[in-house]
């Protein structure tokens, strides 16, 4: 099992690496975001719409875990029989991904029509704790 991090804008890169001891961890980013972290291999992809997402999906295997806040990438990871988790500890499942994709679509339609939608709130320690708990549970389930 490998851990794939959609590293562009991911606030839990260091936390994920720390929790993933004993597993291969890959940070995938585009040329506008450079990462070099001990305990992880960095894969840099050329810039392009969804280039990082497709790079992860094309490299991952069934059973791998993807850390992403991108619902589209999460859906692709699930389709490849992987698991996906966001930076706040929400585990994406076949049961919740359709609703999340629909919510994203509605937000895009509102913005295209000139409307505004809420942006993300400031990150809290509780979100880090939630991520740590959920991610640790995923790792434990994989080793049982």
Swiss-Prot record:
Transmembrane segments: none
Region (Disordered): 110-144
Domain of life of the source: Bacteria
Sequence ranges of Basic residues compositional bias: 113-124
InterPro entries found in the cross-reference section: UPF0178 (IPR003791)
Pfam families reported for this sequence: DUF188
HAMAP family: UPF0178 (MF_00489)
Family per record: Belongs to the UPF0178 family.
Entry protein name: UPF0178 protein Exig_1155
């Amino acid at each position: 099992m490998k851990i794939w991090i959609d590293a562009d804008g991911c606030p839990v890169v260091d936390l994920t690496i720390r929790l993933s001891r004993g597993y291969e961890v890959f940070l995938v980013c585009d040329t506008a975001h450079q990462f070099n972290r001990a305990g992880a291999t960095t894969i840099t992809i050329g810039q392009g719409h969804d280039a990082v997402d497709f790079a992860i999906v094309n490299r991952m295997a069934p059973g791998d875990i993807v850390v992403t806040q991108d619902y589209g990438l999460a859906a692709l990871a699930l389709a490849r029989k992987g698991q996906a988790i966001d930076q706040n500890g929400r585990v994406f499942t076949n049961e919740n991904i359709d609703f999340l994709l629909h919510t994203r679509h509605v937000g895009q339609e509102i913005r295209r029509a000139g409307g505004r939608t809420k942006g993300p709130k400031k990150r809290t320690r509780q979100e880090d704790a939630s991520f740590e708990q959920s991610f640790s549970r995923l790792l434990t389930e994989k080793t049982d």
